[in-house]
């Protein structure tokens, strides 16, 4: 039987704040949380371990089905990710992993293979789904949809600050180029290109604090939930 538990989708480009906002909103609502980007990154890690070529869709699809991905949700503190039993949480946040995940996500067969795995996260009392096609492809029937955006410069600045705080040396210019290239790949791919659902609420997070965005999203749910 199809689970009809409520779903809030939060889509947007890399660095728009959807991961942080989604985790906090899910924790406050007491709902489950799906980080679809982490799922693609996890497959990317497994593919790199197996030294697979992104030009070999059949091998990547086999890898997708053979890879066991587990999420240990720590609420607002973040998400711990295991690939075949190994903790890869820190590896998932590397820029190289993100680039590989973006390339893999452009392969229709891989997206199809992961579709039902993502939909399986939908269960009571509800789900907050964070990604790029949550509201358009994975959960088109979601009652609540949000699309977060921000300028490429704003997103590069946020990422640069995060990496510098972790002791990772990278230039703002390099990050900006990577983000702009990723935006182009995500928007131009044939299957499930990055775009806002027609019924999504658009929120530009440029210059806005995380808590303000969280309050707007939680308020949206409150306004649209029958009393």
UniProtKB/Swiss-Prot annotation:
Keyword Transport: no
Transmembrane annotation, as ranges: none
EC number from the UniProt entry: 2.7.4.25
CDD domains reported for this sequence: CMPK
Record's GO cellular component terms: cytoplasm
Residues where ATP binds: 12-20
A GO biological process held by the record: pyrimidine nucleotide metabolic process
Localisation per UniProt entry: Cytoplasm
Catalyzed reaction equations: CMP + ATP = CDP + ADP; dCMP + ATP = dCDP + ADP
Location (main, coarse): cytoplasm
Domain of life where this protein originates: Bacteria
GO MF term set: ATP binding; CMP kinase activity; dCMP kinase activity
SUPFAM superfamilies tied to this protein: P-loop containing nucleoside triphosphate hydrolases (SSF52540)
Keyword terms: ATP-binding, Cytoplasm, Kinase, Nucleotide-binding, Transferase
UniProt record similarity statement: Belongs to the cytidylate kinase family. Type 1 subfamily.
Identification of the protein by name: Cytidylate kinase
Species annotation: Xanthomonas oryzae pv. oryzae (strain KACC10331 / KXO85)
């Amino acid at each position: 039987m199809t689970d009809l538990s409520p779903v809030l989708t939060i889509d947007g480009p890399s660095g728009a704040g959807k991961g942080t906002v989604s985790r906090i909103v899910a924790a406050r609502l007491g709902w489950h949380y799906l980080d679809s980007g982490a799922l693609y990154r996890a497959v990317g890690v497994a593919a790199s371990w197996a030294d697979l070529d992104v030009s070999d869709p059949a091998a990547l699809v086999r890898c997708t089905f053979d890879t066991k991905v587990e999420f240990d949700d720590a609420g607002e503190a973040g998400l711990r990710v295991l690939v075949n039993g190994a903790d890869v949480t820190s590896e998932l946040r590397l820029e190289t992993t993100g680039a590989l995940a973006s390339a893999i996500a452009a392969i229709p067969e891989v997206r199809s293979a992961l579709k039902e795995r993502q939909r399986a996260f939908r269960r009571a009392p509800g789900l907050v789904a964070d990604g790029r096609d949550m509201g358009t492809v994975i959960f088109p029937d979601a009652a609540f949809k949000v699309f977060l955006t921000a300028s490429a410069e704003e997103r590069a600045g946020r990422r640069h600050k995060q990496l510098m705080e972790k002791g990772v040396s990278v230039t703002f210019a390099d990050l900006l180029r990577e983000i702009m290239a990723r935006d182009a790949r995500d928007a131009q791919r044939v299957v499930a290109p990055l775009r806002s659902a027609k019924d999504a609420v658009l929120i530009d997070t440029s210059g806005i604090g995380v808590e303000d965005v969280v309050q707007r999203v939680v308020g949206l749910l409150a306004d649209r939930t029958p009393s």
